[in-house]
Amino acid sequence: ADSTRLSLAVTLFFVGCGVGNFFAGPLADALGRKPVVVGSMALYGAAAIASALSPSLTVLFISRFVWGFAAAGPRTLSQAMVRDRYSGEAMARVMTLMQTIFFLAPIVAPLIGKGFLELGGWRWTMGFGVIPAVIIAVWVLTIEETLDVENKRSLELGRVFEGFKIVAKNRVTFGYGLAVTFGFGAFYSFLGSTELVLEDIYDYGDQFFLFFSMMSVFLGLAAFVANRVLQRMSAKRLAFLAGVGLVVSSVGMVIAAVAHNGKPPFLLW
């Protein structure tokens, strides 16, 4: 029960990240990319400090939600900044390159976290979040704003909903958006429960950092391969093939889980 409650700290981070996406985009369209990223990093660092100093689980859960909310800023706006400068297949290649970097970071993160746990406990691990927040904020301040003045949009609520309506009415955009939503929903659910499953189901809790790093290697490798494939294949076809692969693998995992009473073989999982 305690491990389940503690896993909420991870889950709430991703929930906050999902909620933050609805605010980061409209704010960046009105104010520009740089101010929103820098502001997000300031909130990110403050939430990291609050998490490190939290006197109770309630405070920890709240600060983790805020932390995730702030993390949505650079995550969302990095893609927006690419769209400001690229389009078509070139944009897809840059996006997959970004995904490679995004997935490579978690390879070293568990190792750093384990090191801080050995040195000073979980509070040190939480407090470490201040360092990347400062680095990203300083770096963003040194680059040019990518959103042209003529492309800025009003922050009026009606204009914001108008933008959502335009996206919803575009069948292609809405379809891909829905697919990405379900895909990332499953992925974030997996991330939020991985440590709990390794510890309570497979008794590998002490080796979580190792398995997580291995998983990140394959994710980064997949993104790198996708970047190369996009030089010879259209983004639409690659997305279709990836979607088919996800459906087939997901169905296979469900069958394996049912066949083994909810506990599929570890190597398959």
For the regions a language model picked out, list residue spans one by one.
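Extracellular/periplasmic helix-loop-helix junction of adjacent transmembrane segments
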Residues: 1-18
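Cytoplasmic helix-loop-helix junction between adjacent transmembrane helices
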Residues: 63-102
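Juxtamembrane intracellular "pre-TM" segments in multi-pass secondary transporters
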Residues: 146-176
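Helix-to-loop junctions at the C-terminal end of transmembrane segments
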Residues: 21-31, 222-236
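Residue-level signature of mid-helix packing/kink "hotspots" within the transmembrane helices
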Residues: 14-22, 106-107, 216-224
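Helix-loop-helix hairpin linking two adjacent transmembrane segments in secondary transporters
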Residues: 59, 88-89, 96-141
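Structural signature of the two symmetry-related core transmembrane helices
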Residues: 35-49, 130, 238-253
